[in-house]
């Protein structure tokens, strides 16, 4: 066995660190403008999904990431319901280079938040007396790569607020 000696101070750990601190709903809304009449119609829905992510640096090495899912469902030409959730998380992220930090905030964290947002939307929709809303998984890595390509072509640099 070998003994390692230190000068009394713990060696500083510069290895990358990531941990979830909190997952929470930041905002939630549901509108069914044509109820109760919409419930008496034949159900032939069309679904439009819009998603967006935002991130901002908090104190120290903490970051907030917010995933917004907005769903508009029409039955024929009429809006059956509009539902939106802002699912947020606070993450401790340390010792990452700029590229890894950008990817973590732009793809990895939204991947963590998506199942929570999807379940919240589904619960909200069924409580509104509509059929379950089964959203397909989203490839945030591909969306992140597309956004980085778009920014590169536009001569923009990724930023972390």
From Swiss-Prot:
GO biological processes: protein folding; protein tetramerization; protein transport
Pfam family of the protein (one): SecB
Protein location: Cytoplasm
UniProt GO molecular function: unfolded protein binding
GO cellular component, one term: cytoplasm
Keywords assigned by UniProt, alphabetized: Chaperone, Cytoplasm, Protein transport, Translocation, Transport
UniProt keyword Protein transport present: yes
Subunit organization: Homotetramer, a dimer of dimers. One homotetramer interacts with 1 SecA dimer.
Similarity field: Belongs to the SecB family.
Function: One of the proteins required for the normal export of preproteins out of the cell cytoplasm. It is a molecular chaperone that binds to a subset of precursor proteins, maintaining them in a translocation-competent state. It also specifically binds to its receptor SecA.
Name used for this protein in its record: Protein-export protein SecB
Species the sequence originates in: Pseudomonas putida (strain W619)
């Amino acid at each position: 066995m070998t003994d390692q000696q230190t000068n009394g101070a713990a060696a500083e750990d510069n290895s990358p660190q990531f941990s979830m601190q909190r997952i929470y709903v930041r905002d939630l809304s549901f509108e069914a403008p044509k109820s109760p009449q919409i419930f008496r119609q034949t159900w032939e829905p069309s679904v439009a999904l819009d998603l967006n992510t935002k991130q901002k640096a908090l104190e120290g090495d903490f970051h907030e990431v917010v995933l917004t899912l907005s769903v508009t469902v029409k039955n024929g030409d009429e809006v059956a319901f509009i539902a939106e959730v802002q699912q947020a998380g606070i993450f401790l992220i340390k010792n990452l280079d700029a590229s890894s930090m950008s990817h973590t905030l732009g793809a990895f964290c939204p991947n963590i938040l998506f199942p929570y947002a999807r379940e919240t939307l589904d619960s909200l929709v069924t409580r509104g007396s509509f059929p379950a809303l089964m959203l397909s998984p989203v490839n945030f890595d591909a969306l992140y790569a597309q956004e980085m390509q778009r920014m590169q072509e536009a001569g923009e640099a990724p930023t972390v607020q």
